[in-house]
Amino acid sequence: RAEGIGVICRELEKENPALPVILTGDFNAKAGASAPYTRALEAGFRDAWVEAPEKKGPPVTWSAFAAPKEGEDSRIDWVLFRGNVSAKSCETVLYNEDGRYPTDHFPVLAGLTLAP
């Protein structure tokens, strides 16, 4: 996974490195101290969940089709950005119908602003 994010970062550097980039997805690694997360930060990416002043929902994105447990912290789905982008809000969407979740991941919704 760390090599995968490394490939993405190297390919992005071939383009105009001054352009803003938004990178999202299921990285199958916890945000924080995992190698892919560290590699992304070293490449200049910032994490919308960390940067956003307004947060909603728990810091959990993998659900195993169940509600998150109190105090759980397992963000493996990230919204990363770099360049002239800022995070205004970030939310883990806990949508379910009668306790049935449509997927084993909670969607992440980020409010981002692109500066001129």
Located regions from the model:
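Active-site regions of metal-assisted phosphoester/phosphodiester hydrolases
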Residues: 1-116
